[in-house]
A protein has these predicted regions:
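Beta-rich nucleic-acid/ligand-interaction surfaces
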Residues: 186-194
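Short, hydrophobic/π-rich interface segment
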Residues: 126-186
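Short beta-strand-to-coil "C-cap" segments at the C-terminal boundary of structured domains/repeats
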Residues: 195-199
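Short coil/loop linkers at secondary-structure junctions
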Residues: 28, 72-75, 157, 177
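Phosphate-binding glycine-rich loops and adjacent basic patches that engage nucleotide phosphates
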Residues: 20-30, 41-48, 109-111, 126-136, ...
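N-terminal, charged low-complexity regulatory/assembly segments
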Residues: 1-67
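Amphipathic interaction/junction segments at domain boundaries or subunit interfaces
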Residues: 57, 61-63, 67-153
Length: 199
């Protein structure tokens, strides 16, 4: 994958979050994670959707965590989750449920979904956006997932399902409700995200 400042920044960001979490758990030497992440990035197929670049980089970093740390996927997931929860920058970047679910953003979302179907990057996400209805305020159907793709490319498709859990954590931090009944990572035909304001 081509190098970019944003991709480099996201890699450094995830490492800065996880490093103190590893230290808390008595894992002192994790320098190899950075090296392995760089190796994965070099091999990675293109993913040129700026909205989901951080997720793609996170997928690579999670693979590196599992190859180097000596901990289980569940333990590494907890390290990543705890690091994100404790990050003021991450929480600020998420914003509020009210802002996220604002219908004024729908036009841009429809354009984003249409653009995703052009599959400009081999490991891009592909999705549909669903408008507000009686059951939810915003829906997404994802038919292809960049995290699933990079995990499959790296020979560890079983790791993708752990990162799916972060979607619920992020919704909770925004004070939004997320309902999802199936995921690509667990073999479904698509992921069905349904967001609502907590009432």
């Amino acid at each position: 994958m081509k190098k970019s400042f944003k991709a480099w920044f996201y890699g450094k960001f995830f490492h800065s979050l996880c490093k103190p979490q590893y230290k808390k758990r008595g894992v002192s030497d994790i320098s190899g994670i950075i090296k392995e992440h760089k190796n994965i990035y070099t091999r990675a197929k293109e993913m040129n959707d700026e909205k989901l670049l951080s997720s793609y980089i996170m997928g690579m970093y999670f693979i590196a965590m599992n190859r180097v740390s000596g901990l289980s996927p569940e333990e590494n997931y907890r390290i990543l989750e705890d690091g994100l929860k404790e990050s003021a920058m991450f929480r600020k970047g998420l914003g509020t449920a009210e802002a996220y679910l604002d219908e004024k953003r729908m036009a841009a979302r429809y354009e984003w979904a249409a653009e995703s179907k052009k599959r400009k990057g081999e490991n891009n996400w592909v999705l549909d956006v669903l408008p507000k209805c009686s059951e939810y305020d915003l829906g997404y159907d994802y038919y292809e997932c960049g995290i699933c793709k990079i995990c499959k490319d790296e020979g560890c498709p079983e790791l993708a399902k752990y990162l799916c859990k972060l979607d619920f954590m992020m919704a909770d931090l925004m004070n939004a409700k997320l309902v999802r009944t199936k995921t690509l990572a667990e073999g479904a035909d698509y992921c069905d995200f349904r967001y609502s304001l907590k009432r």
